[in-house]
Design a protein with these regions (language model features):
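Short loop/beta submotifs within extracellular cysteine-rich repeat domains
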Residues: 59-61, 107, 133-135, 170-171
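Carbohydrate-binding/catalytic loop surfaces
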Residues: 67-85, 136-154, 206-231
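Low-complexity, Ser/Thr/Pro/Gly-enriched N-terminal "stalk/linker" regions
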Residues: 13-85, 203
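Long, well-ordered core segments of solenoidal/helical folds
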Residues: 46-60, 117-134, 187-205
């Protein structure tokens, strides 16, 4: 309830031109390109509150949402979807970008809720890894091609980058996890790299390329949508 009041309170306020300039930008660009000085502003805090609202109880986030836009009357609908288990994903930078913003905001203002939400996202990330080291496109619930190990749109590679940077303490992912968690991250990272090696397509005994998706059991190239054939 406090989050709702916080977000709605900001939504009712007038926005200056600088605020409007930020809101007109793509969410990914705000997260990746905003200077550290922006992160201590009220608008940056509002964006962080939106990130908390959008986080599913799975720990992940849905894709293709302009999370920095005012929530307004949509907030009740968003909160009603908190328990959805079939739209948390790393496709199109979802979850990755929200975790990055929370990490930056935690360093900037020290709000413990941002770290808590980040770690919840990390648990979602680690729980999604298959025993063979790969990740599906959506989890914990998925169907059809969503179950495949997914390289498309850098989904798995971005996940591995976050895991590596957390393990190695690379900004903005420094200081967020303890040594025991870093050991888990190291294991997950090496499993992921081994999966990449194991899914590399061999032609006449020579290692070549990868498909966008690979079967989670056989590791063979797999189809996705009707126009996304298992080509390479």
């Amino acid at each position: 309830m406090m989050t709702c009041l916080f977000v709605n309170g900001y939504a009712q306020r007038g926005l200056n031109l600088k605020d409007l300039n930020y809101r007109s930008r793509e969410w990914k660009m705000i997260v990746r390109s905003s200077p550290d000085s922006f992160l201590t502003t009220p608008l940056a805090r509002q964006f962080a509150e939106n990130v908390l609202v959008w986080q599913r109880n799975t720990g992940g986030w849905p894709k293709n949402e302009a999370i920095h836009r005012p929530l307004g009357g949509d907030i009740e609908l968003i909160l009603a979807d908190k328990n959805k288990r079939n739209d948390s994903t790393t496709d199109n930078d979802a979850t990755i970008i929200e975790m990055t913003y929370l990490a930056r905001m935690w360093h900037a203002v020290g709000d413990p809720r941002y770290k808590e939400a980040f770690l919840k996202g990390l648990r979602f990330m680690l729980d999604g890894q298959y025993d063979n080291g790969g990740w599906p496109q959506f989890w914990p619930e998925n169907r059809g091609y969503q179950v495949h190990i997914t390289y498309n749109d850098d989904a798995m590679v971005q996940t591995l980058r976050v895991i590596r940077d957390l393990r190695d303490g690379i900004k903005p992912f420094d200081g967020l996890v303890d040594e025991s968690t870093k050991a888990l991250l190291d294991k997950a990272f090496h499993k992921g790299i081994q999966c990449i090696l194991n899914t590399q397509i061999k032609v006449n005994g020579k290692r070549t390329v990868w498909c966008q998706q690979h079967d989670r059991e056989t590791l063979a190239p797999a189809a996705a949508r009707s126009y996304e054939l298992p080509s390479y």
